[in-house]
Regions:
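An acidic-aromatic substrate-binding cleft motif
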Residues: 105-114, 123-169, 173, 177
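Alpha-helical scaffolding within the catalytic cores
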Residues: 131-134, 161-165, 190-196, 228-237
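Active-site-adjacent "subsite" loops/lids of carbohydrate-active enzymes
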Residues: 206-257
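N-terminal accessory beta-strand-rich subdomains and adjacent acidic, glycine-rich linkers
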Residues: 1-129
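Aromatic- and glycine-enriched glycan-recognition loops and surfaces
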Residues: 152-211, 215-216
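Active-site-adjacent beta->alpha loops and helix N-cap segments on the catalytic face
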Residues: 189-193, 259-265
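Conserved small/polar residues in nucleotide/adenosyl-binding loops
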Residues: 267-273
């Protein structure tokens, strides 16, 4: 048996102390006996190849605001793995490692998908099959394709003219959306964003805007900051987004997987829905 596993990084290291960011490199067909790069195990989902006999995918689903996210431990004697809780250093050392909840309660699902080839692994619906919707929405989600200038042109592309180019690109390709990444609040501004949303709509394109998760858990400077970690400011921002007709947000750089982080993530999902964003 060999593995395709993404190692869990040390916490509070890397760029602006944002790790673990779940972007580490994996080794293809690594032996099960290998220890993880950082000694903290692996980030879900975890893929194993059983020689010529098939594949196994181990993962987690159904994490909500009342629990924490987990990971797979390093391998122990006998090629055994366990489910591991977040590291103490995550969230800048704040918060608890072990979750707690009132009874009756339930832990997230840990799932194992088995296939004699990769097709059932790729196409599995088990992450949705075993859970129920957590809340009702006021509108239907419209999935689609989009353009994103940052992935190629980085921070320098977050200006009005370059975003017009990427909106035009989305329109020409027949894509539904365009994502405007960090620094838009200072390099484009709230006032000009209104005209950019209107320009995009005339082109048949809707916009997503980037936000920092903010908080005390990293050193991120990219704006907008201090908008998503304060309930009053967050509601005000959502009202503004709704008034412009912005269709969605990308919230970046959470501090970890501790139980304290999950309600923040949950709020970022439910509040936009209530504001039709």
């Amino acid at each position: 048996t060999t593995t395709f596993l993404c190692p869990q990084s040390d916490a509070m290291i890397g760029w602006k102390r944002t790790k673990p960011s779940y972007e580490e490199e994996y080794k293809a067909d690594a032996p099960m006996s290998d220890r993880s790069q950082y000694g903290h195990g692996y980030t879900f989902p975890c893929l194993f190849r059983i020689g010529n006999d098939g594949w196994v995918l181990v993962s987690e689903t159904g994490v909500d605001s009342r629990y924490c996210g987990s990971r797979l431990s390093d391998v122990s004697e006998g090629n055994l793995y366990t489910v591991a809780f977040p590291m103490a250093e995550e969230n800048n050392g704040n918060g608890t490692v072990a979750p707690a909840f009132a009874l009756p309660g339930a832990t997230p699902w840990r799932t194992i998908t088995v296939g004699d080839h990769l097709k059932p692994i790729v196409e599995t619906t088990v992450p949705w099959d075993v859970v129920s919707p957590l809340y009702e929405t006021k509108h239907d989600y419209r999935f689609g394709r989009g353009t994103w200038s940052w992935i190629l042109w980085q921070d320098g592309s977050i200006n009005y003219d370059d975003q017009v180019r990427y909106i035009d690109f989305a329109s020409a390709m027949g894509y539904e959306y365009a994502l405007i990444d960090n620094w838009w609040d200072t390099r484009i501004g709230h006032q000009r964003m209104k005209s950019l949303v209107e320009y995009a709509r005339d082109k048949g394109v809707e916009l997503f805007l980037w936000y920092s998760s903010s908080g005390y858990w990293n050193d991120i400077e990219q704006g907008p900051v201090n908008r998503m970690d304060n309930a009053i400011i967050r509601k005000r921002e959502m009202k503004w987004l709704q008034s412009l007709g912005v269709k969605g947000i990308k919230v970046d750089f959470f501090g970890g997987d501790k139980q304290e982080t999950m309600p923040v993530s949950y709020t970022h999902l439910t509040l936009p829905t209530n504001r039709e964003v």
